[in-house]
């Protein structure tokens, strides 16, 4: 989010030269720079011991392609706690091991997505109301079910070691 008004006092921001940052919004009333902000989210490639990845269908995200488990961090929650919670909420699975992979800026929605590999024991899914369907997909078939170049596609490609 780029600030036009101060979120603390409501004053209109002015552009001010701030060191190496250059021109940026500044609140003269509060005497503070107004740094751009983003929503921090997680995205998980959920994998099992059979070399399969859990892919989800969520109509509100894509009518034609699959996605990965993803969600917004809650205040006071670590990224790892968010990832474990989202896997449990969306798929009803318990994470055995969590590995951080990398971060992915998603400028279109002003988000920073933190990518994880979540290792689970293969089991039937207990889907949340926001998931239309999910399936275990062999590593060799996973990328073709995701939108090429999407953050989910990039994460799964890294996790399964595809080139």
What does each model-found stretch correspond to?
Residues 1-2, 14, 63-66, 107, ...:
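Nudix hydrolase/Nudix homology domain
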């Amino acid at each position: 989010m780029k600030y036009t008004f101060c979120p603390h006092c409501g004053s209109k921001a002015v552009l001010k030269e701030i060191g190496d940052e250059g021109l940026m919004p500044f609140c003269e009333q509060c005497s503070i720079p107004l740094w751009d902000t983003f929503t921090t989210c997680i995205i998980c490639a959920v994998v099992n011991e059979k070399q399969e990845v859990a892919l989800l269908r969520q109509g509100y995200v894509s009518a034609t392609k699959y996605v990965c488990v993803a969600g917004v961090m809650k205040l006071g929650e670590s990224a790892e706690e968010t990832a474990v919670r989202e896997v449990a909420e969306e798929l009803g699975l318990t994470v055995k091991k969590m590995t951080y992979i990398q971060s992915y800026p998603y400028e279109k929605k002003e988000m920073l997505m933190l990518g994880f590999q979540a290792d689970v024991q293969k089991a039937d899914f207990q889907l949340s109301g926001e998931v239309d369907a999910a399936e275990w997909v062999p590593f060799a078939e996973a990328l073709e079910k995701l939108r090429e170049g999407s953050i989910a596609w990039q994460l799964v490609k890294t996790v399964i070691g595809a080139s």
